[in-house]
Amino acid sequence: MQIDADIAMQKPFNILKKETHYYAVTEDEPLENNTYLSYNKVVGTALDKKLYLAMQILDYVLVMAPGAKLKQALIDKGIGTDIYSSLESSVLQPVYSIVAKNAEESQKKAFVDTIEEVLRDIAKNGIDKRMALAGMNYYEFKFREADYGAYPKGLMYYLTMMDSWLYDENEPFIHVEALDTFAQLRKELDEGLFEELIQKYLLDNSHGSLIALVPKRGLEEEKAAEEAKRLETYKNSLSKEELEAIVADTAALKAYQDEPSPQEELERIPMLKLSDIEREPAKLYIDKKSIADVDVIHHNLFTNQIAYLMLAFDCKKVPDELLPYVGLLSSVLGLMDTHKHTYPELTNEININSGGIATDAAIYTDSKDFSKYTVMYEVKGKVLYEKLPFVLEMMHEIIYETKFEDEKRLREIIARIKSRMESNMTGSGHTVAMLSAMAQFSPSSYYSDILRGYQYYEFIEKADRDFDSMKEMLAENLKRTAALIFTKENLTVSFTAGDDGLELLQKPMTEFVAKLAQLQEKDAVRTFRPVKEKTAYTSSSQVQYVARCGNYRKAGYEYTGALKVLKIIFSYDYLWLNVRVKGGAYGCMSGFYRNGDTYMVSYRDPNLAETNTIFEQAAEYVRRFDVSERDMVKFIIGTIGGMDTPMNPASKGVRSFGAYICHTEYAQLKKEREEVLNATKESIRALAPLIETAVSQDYLCVVGNNAKIRENEQMFEKIEPLFL
């Protein structure tokens, strides 16, 4: 059979299409400054390999880079508080979009006029070549490094190949053989390439649209009423026999969902044997050195002359009331002016000379004494060996010379954080629900919540709302927090490279340490004050995220590797069948940590009380767990698959440093792996009391639809809007 799989080209529009659509908000959410404006243009085809990369670099210059000209022009005119972009390059006719969030519908004309004014200026007067060069280096470094985290490189290369191969069977490699294209782009940077692209694809191109997405209260109820009316009309049009057939089909579907697949069919699927699996866990690379009296944890690995450097500063001197500022620092450092560079200049220098510098806050729990945890502020960079002096110089400038008193820039950053957090909470409510529930009993989760969770959102929302009255305090507290963190006493270094890289680190690290501040300050006293409240956060979402949490160690139970197997069993059997297949949720997850913290959570779930009941019955399922020997082996193999995800040198270094900070010994990892490989039905059933203990503690948090939560309000002690 010959199938015509060709995708037809869409005809271009004669003029820019303009449309207005609506999205639902609750009564608690504002209508003002809550519109999305999107400017969209079709740009060539996915088979143009030069355009494929050039548009990514152009996007970097226009919107993505800190201080990008087009983004800054929109923000300066008050058209949205968060400007972002997207390049959909995996379709035959790629689409480039510029989006203003938190705008007004009345700003549509100003939005388009500002975009086109900036584009005309760049097309006429030239692109910022240094920023374009930074963008090229940023993407080329990423391409050469090919760091895809836990995803196999082969898979990611294949997905890139599909961006062209889908549309021309003779062109599978044009986007994975990109080095020549990067070289060509560097050559044409001074020949007007990007100015021509702006003129051709963004200014003179009518194949585009302007979309306004406007908030509307009551829209969800309108749609629900329309759907109910449509279904009622359809039902009334059916005969008695047709109605009975639908009932019978539904019953048949439920029976099919409950019926296991025939064993003979399952056994046709090839499967590994346990004897095929390596019994030793992955090696830890921990070689403790000292440079200028600072501990340097060397992860001795071949990195192809790329050094992965992390400066980890213990936040032990930061008092509880300043911990939210530790989270804020990670969004401020590197994105504000310093005494030597404006923040766009700083970004250009970093991306031209390195693979980037990033900062973040992290929490490590001791693997032997679970009452101990460490809050660390991490400054990370990746560079070629010869650029180590440069990256340390930039790190010093960022942590010591940032101008926190720049009120305009600080306001922009806080508004952007708020916007991004609200977007993330909408699509990832399960993380909000899980962390909020666990923060009620787990110290490490409590402080994670302060640094990046809902408590941090509350801090950011207040800082955004009351910025004018708080701005001096915000700047002063950022300075104070930085001073308490960035000292020699607090520093431990993680360094992933070969011995030759370590040798090249000695001199610049010695010079860096010599310039570190020394501060005589007592360690802060942490005060964990948990408040147990069954909480629901309401939004206009049509789905729920239901989290049920607890801690099995509180009843004296110990961690075992069999819990890792149970996680897989839940993911592919109990929770999968009940929450996803029968319940209709998009996903379900669980976790059992070494410190006893336990969670079960649903993802994009149409249900609420029903899912909570499924979580409550989990211990009984474990108590009665019974599968064939073959299925037990499958669960073990699935567990090992999660433990043995591909790791590049950078990932191995991160894992090893985490083990060092948490005092995790190789023997612990080996014991855990043996417990996984030796897991049996009996060892799984023995976990029932652990699950029962955790669930019975009754820590519940739900993020979801306002009406659905109100229907089940008796389940909660506190109900609040998700967005403040």
Model-identified regions with their sequence ranges:
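Long, compositionally biased intrinsically disordered regions
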Residues: A183, E196-L284, E422, L435-S539, ...
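His/Glu-based metal-binding/catalytic segments typifying zinc-dependent metallopeptidases
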Residues: D4-G67, P152-E171, H175, S237-G334, ...
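Short alpha-helical segments and helix-capping/turn motifs at coil-helix boundaries
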Residues: E19-A24, D180-T181, E191-K200, D293-V296, ...
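Bacterial peptidoglycan biogenesis and beta-lactam-recognition machinery
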Residues: Q2-I3, F404
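Short intrinsically disordered coil segments
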Residues: Y52-I57, D113, E226-E232, H396-E397, ...
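M16 family metallopeptidases and their MPP-like homologs
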Residues: N34-G44, K71-R186, S206-K216, E222, ...
